[in-house]
């Protein structure tokens, strides 16, 4: 029997965007190259998680007074070390991290008139009717007398459009979790702080009981599907077969595939053209235990511990929507 699939906001978002991407990510567990945006987001989250603790407020005060990380050698050093660890250090990445960290610190970081008692709060919601399980992490819950504000940091290049915000899975999941974790705080607001937008970083949303009730039935629907998901299902809702999104529909449909026609294609400025990590074929390695279970996949053989199992060389053939199929009569064309 396959392992139970527990929902998360990112898992649902992937499932909605493309069935093949979901299959590659959560069933095949194929490796992915990290990118600078993800690296910067990881580093910023680490700094926020540390500075929100009262014992580190002296670093916050120094940085805010000088408006630069130079004022705290310890924080500056940690940012640089973290970027190196993420294999993404460059002066450009460091300066972008500094800018984003300053935006986060400058926006009610300690929750004026509120308390931040549980940063990086983990939750697991289990419901029998409707039936679902969903887990997640809340970046920063700010508790007030009768209100809870859940702050989530975003390092993306674009903010949510109106439709993306009003039906945001992550925000609804956070609000559901808040009902369990902080039952006395009935007024729940979710605030997304977009760190690349210093002039207007905040987007806020709250939901009604009716909206949350409907969301729970949607969770049951997705939970049922992903726990009976097959390779045939993986080809049933491909991003490439969806219509191109309208201006107010955000990043969806074929945009998820990217416009690159082949691996390594360059844009006019000489930089790599982005594409879905599973669009084209690639080689990788798998670590398999004695019972035949997959332990880990990696592009680098050196990342796998051979003492824990057998290392196998693997080939991924690419997305079926973008892979040219062999044709016995191809010579006629």
Give residue ranges: language-model regions.
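Hydrophobic (often cysteine-bearing) scaffold residues that line and stabilize catalytic clefts
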Residues: 36, 40, 44, 93, ...
């Amino acid at each position: 029997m396959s392992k139970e699939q527990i929902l998360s906001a990112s898992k649902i978002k992937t499932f909605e965007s493309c069935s093949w991407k979901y299959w590659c990510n959560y069933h095949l567990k194929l490796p992915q190259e990290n990118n600078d945006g993800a690296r910067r987001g990881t580093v910023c989250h680490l700094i926020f998680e540390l500075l929100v603790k009262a014992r580190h407020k002296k670093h916050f005060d120094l940085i805010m007074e000088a408006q630069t990380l130079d004022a705290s050698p310890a924080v500056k050093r940690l940012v640089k070390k973290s970027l190196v660890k993420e294999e993404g250090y460059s002066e450009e990445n460091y300066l972008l991290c500094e800018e984003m960290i300053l935006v986060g610190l400058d926006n009610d970081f300690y929750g004026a008139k509120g308390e931040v008692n549980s940063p990086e709060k983990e939750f697991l919601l289990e419901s029998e009717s409707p039936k679902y399980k969903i887990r997640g992490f809340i970046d920063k819950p700010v508790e007030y007398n009768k209100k809870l504000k859940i702050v989530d940091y975003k390092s993306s290049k674009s903010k949510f459009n109106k439709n993306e915000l009003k039906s945001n899975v992550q925000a609804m999941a956070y609000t559901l979790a808040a009902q369990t974790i902080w039952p006395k705080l009935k007024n729940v607001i979710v605030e997304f702080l977009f760190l690349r937008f210093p002039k207007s970083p905040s987007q806020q949303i709250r939901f009604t009981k009716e909206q949350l009730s409907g969301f729970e039935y949607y969770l049951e629907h997705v939970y049922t599907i992903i726990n009976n998901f097959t390779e045939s299902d993986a080809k049933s809702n491909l991003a490439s077969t969806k219509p191109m999104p309208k201006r107010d529909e955000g990043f969806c449909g074929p945009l998820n595939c990217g416009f690159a026609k082949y691996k390594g294609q360059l844009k006019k400025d000489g930089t790599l053209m982005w594409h879905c990590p599973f669009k084209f074929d690639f080689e990788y390695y798998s670590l398999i235990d004695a019972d035949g279970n997959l332990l880990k996949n990696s592009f680098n053989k050196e990342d796998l511990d051979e003492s824990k199992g057998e290392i196998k060389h693997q080939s991924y053939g690419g997305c079926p929507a973008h892979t040219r199929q062999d044709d016995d009569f191809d010579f006629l064309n």
